[in-house]
């Protein structure tokens, strides 16, 4: 009996040793992610900055965060050993989404900068076309009906048909990134008015990961959107210390009701990786080791 107990104990210890490193990934483990689509949620506080690795190993950014957020963005890109970016998508021109564009382009070679071709309001704040031109990147103005093949992933673009001069957030470009049966829905600062138009005109908005519009505040993320998207994970680009509205109790309760696991811009991690293998998605913490 004692011998059997010892064998059971050894087996348990072996399993613990094998799984001890699970849940975190560092610089030395990034090669294992090739062949997957990976969304890296960079921990910059109130602001949007994401790195997207497509299955063939190419890299895109979805928004850049503020200028002062650049050190954290650079840290993540260094962990990932990124030297070149195939493209940068800017959902709109607010500084907490696009303010870091020039600093990124100073260090990294960027092939293309993707903009909404219908937004003649928010981009004026940062003039991304001039920045792209200065660094030799091609500017691609999207109209909202494109389906882009990007290195084994697909980016389906949606842009609101009517520009909103009263609420600039509702001019945000939305892109659904998909790889086989997995997908990420990136929404910029889309609020409820734009959500309604999106749901009326976008055929299949289901996604495993939903980036909540407008930093998780109560003016976005309607019940109708959650019912249509049916996400497993919800990303909120804000935290209680910097922006209490981002940890809105009503939205938190709504996410819980719909079975959505929420991730905020808080903690010591450099980023959270949402790793899509084409069948399912898992969330893994990225630490600066």
Enumerate the language-model features and the residues they cover.
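Non-globular, low-confidence helical/coil segments that flank catalytic cores
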Residues: 2-7, 17-289
């Amino acid at each position: 009996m004692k011998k059997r107990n010892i064998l059971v104990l050894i087996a348990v210890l072996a399993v613990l040793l094998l799984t001890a490193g699970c849940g975190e990934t560092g610089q030395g483990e990034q090669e294992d992610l090739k062949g997957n689509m990976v969304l890296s949620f960079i921990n910059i506080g109130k602001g949007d900055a994401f790195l997207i690795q497509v299955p063939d190993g190419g890299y895109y950014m979805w928004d850049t965060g503020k200028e002062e957020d650049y050190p954290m963005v650079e840290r993540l890109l260094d962990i990932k050993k990124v030297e070149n970016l195939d493209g940068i998508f800017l959902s709109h021109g607010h500084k907490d989404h696009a303010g870091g564009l020039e600093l990124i382009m100073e260090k990294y070679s960027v092939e293309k900068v993707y903009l909404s071709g219908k937004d003649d309001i928010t981009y004026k704040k940062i003039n991304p076309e001039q920045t792209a031109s200065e660094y030799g990147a091609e500017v691609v103005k999207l109209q909202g009906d494109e389906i882009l093949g990007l290195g084994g992933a697909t980016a389906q673009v949606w842009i609101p048909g009517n520009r909103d001069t009263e609420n600039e957030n509702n001019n945000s470009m939305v892109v659904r990134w998909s790889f086989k049966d997995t997908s990420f829905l990136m929404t910029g600062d889309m609020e409820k008015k734009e959500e309604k138009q999106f749901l009326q005109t976008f055929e299949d908005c289901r996604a495993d990961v939903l980036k909540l519009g407008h930093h998780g505040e109560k003016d976005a993320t309607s019940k109708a959107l959650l019912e249509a998207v049916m996400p497993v994970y919800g990303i909120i680009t804000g935290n209680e210390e910097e922006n209490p509205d981002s940890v809105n109790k009503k939205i938190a309760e709504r996410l819980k009701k719909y079975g959505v696991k929420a991730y905020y811009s808080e903690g010591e991690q450099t980023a959270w990786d949402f790793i899509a293998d084409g069948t399912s998605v898992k969330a893994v913490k990225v630490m600066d080791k």
